[in-house]
Amino acid sequence: MSELSAADTTLADGYGHLADRAILFHALLTAAGFHPEFVLASELPPLTGITGVAKTFPLPQDFQYPMVKVVVAGQAYYLNDTDQYSQLGATAHDGRLGLVLASRASTEIHAAKNCGNAMKTLYTLSVTDTGRTRVGVTRYYYGGGYGAKNHYFSELPPEECRRYFQETVSQVAQGARPVGGLTTKFDSYPGLEQFTVDVDNYAVVDGKYLYFDLPFTASLFPVGDDHRVLPLFISQGSQETIRTEITLPTDFHRIVIAPQSERLAAPGGTAKITSTTTADQCVITDDLETTPAIIAPADYPALLKVESALRRKSAKVFLLEKE
């Protein structure tokens, strides 16, 4: 206790360690008329095998992050593990186990509504009859991703920003040329990153056919080995949505091959692909979600199967025929 400072001391000094800042948060919220409570957060996900031990015999080394929980209009907010670049309601311990100090009861920490870690990407492809394509890329950042990108772009020097933009453009396709500059907007939520490129030979014309690939390869599990002897631990869940809106070329409207709607599932995650087509447009939406899990070696091939299905050629290629 001798290492802890009073709230007034931390406020006057302008700095303090995590516990000092938690004490200050608690004092300020109490003075403002709220009813905060101290919570010790851990890095442990709420899995059955882990939760049982942690609740029965919580170890001090597992609960080392002092946080302050306050409920406003029925919504819980956790403070003290983010910075000035983060969205209020986000927490680095989303989905982790916590310990309420006053009651010594275990709890599960959650970010506020729409403040969990997530990313949404929108690709717009306008394909011409010659194969030249304009590709627009818009990314929306939520939760911890918002805070990280806001911090990154806020501190990025102009020269480094230009280099980042050049590298980002080159990742879209070989020979991509920027149309305008990079737009970033983090003074509102979610954070936005947006740019547009032209690619002369994005699509290939071969007689009466035209073909091209989606500008990305979806991935649910970044698995490496072909087999495992020990279980695979997925400590953190993820949520990503990738939407691709394709404006078809004037003369090539007959779709011969295109990604199909399907749902792929394995222990610890699901991938849902939705494909819709109109007279002049095709829209592909990939919804990818993983959850914390301990994957037994016997279930590991199911993960490989899902990843293989997402990476196969038929999951990203379009073949159009001239009408």
Language model feature labels by segment:
Residues M1-E323:
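A sensor for short, sequence-defined functional sites
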